[in-house]
């Protein structure tokens, strides 16, 4: 259709299918198998489902972006054979700068298995060359779980502390504060700092590759779950392949 500046990914679609609520298109799909496209964007969460959830509180650039989606699609589908646009298989898709990538859901599991085979192969080679030791491999759990546990705990209890310090936050209908983006940025920076510190303290340069194995293993486990239960997020296997390239 020649849409400019597409921004989307199939994870959004998979999560949408898991939600209990429907959209305006649901009745058309269920009653007449009539296909459609949902447009959605998220920002200024504090306006969502409030009296301020109107066009006056939307960014003009965001509305213009929706128009850039709508007009080419109207032109395309008004001239298309609608009997030939029925999809036979869902696809994984995501945006990267200057292009839009997609591939069938059926590729997700094989891509995960292939990544797993390469992971085991590199692990075997590293053990054979005495680059890896089981002792150091398992010690890699210390900075990994330490970073996850401390960052997760500080984020959870930090937010609880903010709710205690500012009880008026509990009155917000959607739970997103007016300075919510600042809180998100602060907690992200805090989490990254904790991660860097944990690996600085517990992962000496000579054993970094050993500790890297556990990070890749966790990513492999996550992608195994994704391949089975959240296929739309299948593109998250791609960072694993880059990790394997560095690993190899």
Q: Where are these predicted regions, by residue range?
A:
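Soluble extramembrane regions of membrane proteins in the secretory/endomembrane system
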Residues: 1-103
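Short, surface-exposed, charge-dense and proline/glycine-enriched linear segments
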Residues: 38-52, 71-74, 109-125, 203, ...
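A sequence-level detector of short, solvent-exposed, charge-rich linear segments
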Residues: 58, 70, 89, 112-115, ...
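Alpha-helical transmembrane segments of integral membrane proteins
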Residues: 117-248
